[in-house]
Amino acid sequence: MDNYIQFPRYSIYLIPNKLFINQVEKLLLKNNVKYDNLEISQYGLHYTVKAPFYLSHLYNEEELINSFQEYFLSNQNKSYKEVFNVLGLKKIKNVFALEMNSNEKFNFLCNDIMRYFDLYRKTLNQQEVQKDIKRFSNLTSLEMEYYLIWGYPYLFEFSNHHISVSDIKKEIIFDNSIKSLNYSNISLMRQDSINSKFISISKSD
């Protein structure tokens, strides 16, 4: 069911380097899964820093891009460039995900980005909220509170450092072949329609 309010949608993702992407694809092929055939492939392999959002009518895309570029030119916290250890594979809701270690500096950066760019997120009216929230199910009272404040329920204590690699339709056996993760860049992404992939429209290496 199409419960989206409008397109395009925007998001901010940390994008793994090519080595990590190749390792994930090889892992999935060992389990007879092709990443490009999965529904989640429209998002690409990534860690979500700012979940997909609708752009406020108060701003345009050019202003969003300029703000994104200025933020990373002035921010000296480059903790996303560190090497992160892969802790294992786990089920998170309806996906299999590789979980990574984290640290306070990295968590602070991600939360700061999420809050900073919330300025550009469209505030939904009551009718739009009733439609949009159908994308989520069985929210706790605190998850609901986060959704109403930030437009996304799985934040802070309900989130951890992970990259979704497959759905749960087929069991994935992890052979510990992926030891670490380096991010290639942090990207401002755009999705133009319900079936289109998220594409990068600006990035910081």
Protein language model regions, located:
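Basic, often amphipathic N-terminal segments
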Residues: 1-84, 88-90, 105-205
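Generic recognition of long tandem-repeat/solenoid scaffolds
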Residues: 12-14, 96-100
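Short acidic/glycine-enriched loop/turn segments that link adjacent beta-strands
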Residues: 92-94
